[in-house]
Amino acid sequence: MKKKLLVILGAGSSTPLGMPSVPDVDQLMAQWGIEWATWRGTTDHFGKLWQSAEMYYKSGPTGPRPALNFEKVLGDMVALAHWMEPPPWGDTLRQAACGGAPPPELIFQSQEPECEAVEDLLADEGDLVNVEHETIGESLDEVVPASEESPTGKYGAYIELMDELSFLLEKLAQHMRTLCQRFDPATGAAERYRMLLRGLREKFDVGIYNLNYDAAALNALPGSYTGFGEMGTFEPSVIIERSRWDFVYHLHGSVHHSLSQQFGDEICWRRSLDEHFFDGSEGRSNDKRSEGRSFPITTLIAGGFKLDQLLVEPFHLLYATLVRHVYMADAILIGGYGFGDVHVNRALKNRFSRGDGQLPVMILDLAGDRTGPMAFRYDLWAMEVCSAFGADGHFFAEPGRLSPPVPGDLTARGTFEVDAQHRIAIWHGGFVGAERRLPGIIEWLDGAADGVLIPDSGQ
């Protein structure tokens, strides 16, 4: 029986294939935010919140700090939309923090003056309604809270924020699908990507959790189970009962995902990317999750509050199986992942904090020109790696050498940075670049000593 290899793929694994990096998506979101604001004739809230977060981070001391990217700002949009919902449906901290006043530097074109809104609310609490259940229409211009005759009024700011957020998520889904339609499988990078995953599958029973929306892993391993049946319907019972792995699960959504109908909330699987897709649309009703926060009904997960976003299928069950498979795995390979998703990091940390034996963990990453040895790194990526696996950067070394290794030199020599005590190996030459060391990687994941990672060992 083959050993089980759990593979977790982040954005860096598919950027050599023409898929966007996180900074690429940052720029796209900025452009789409301006497009939305121009179309609506209002403020680009994504851009404003980006500037606000950037200013906040810069006001702190130098040193490690949270990453500012599109996902952070999308999460802020969710939080602000909840903050701007009128009582009693919004965030109670707004009353404690600022006496119920809105943010002073943000402008919402369709929000009535705060003093009038508060007077209305105090005058008639019976008019308070949940927008989730009391909205109609497909666009902002048609969304009408039950107690209002137009989108202006108590819910104006909330509607604007959710409208732009839905627009951005829909644009992201469409953009990723277009890139996958244009994907060229004949490139050298695509061939090496396929050889890497197929080589792993020959030796192991491989289960892949793709944190990206692209179809790169599916293209490399056609026939892998996705969690959806022949007719495109989600199959929870099959997922739960499946003993064989050989799957590619898209934990955060896929370009193959579509809402079953334009105003439905069930996600189905479209085999061909040329079919018609429904990715959610701005202005439609939203789904309430924990603490009353609203989230757009869409085909993918992006932004903050991911545990809330994971509460709907297929994401809910796929996350549950990730936790299960972390415990079942005989070895783990992580490719191009920035360790920025707490729900993934925590699943790993819970498994590795038990102290009941270490399994091999191979991390395939692309180091920058100025990246230092793990022993001297204090950036968030290195800190999260050590936290997830209960390791310490000072234990990492190049097999057969004593001095702390420089990642650029390791890549040039075709070797790894290894923590022998915790059985963690880091390849700094990129996901696709690791294909040239595939035999050694396979042997090491299968339990061989660290020596197989030394180039002159014949691997």
Protein language model features and the residues they cover:
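SIR2/sirtuin-family catalytic core signature
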Residues: 1-17, 22-54, 241-244, 313, ...
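Intrinsic disorder/low-structure terminal segments
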Residues: 45, 69, 107, 276-277, ...
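A short acidic-Thr-Gly-centered motif at the start of a beta-strand
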Residues: 1, 192-203, 318-327
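Generic alpha-helical structural element
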Residues: 185, 206-209, 311, 333, ...
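Extended, H/D-rich, highly charged conserved domains that either
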Residues: 46-174, 181-189, 193-298
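Glycine- and acidic
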Residues: 304-308, 329-331
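Gly-rich Lys/Arg/Thr-decorated short loops/hinges at beta-loop-alpha junctions or inter-strand turns
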Residues: 298-304
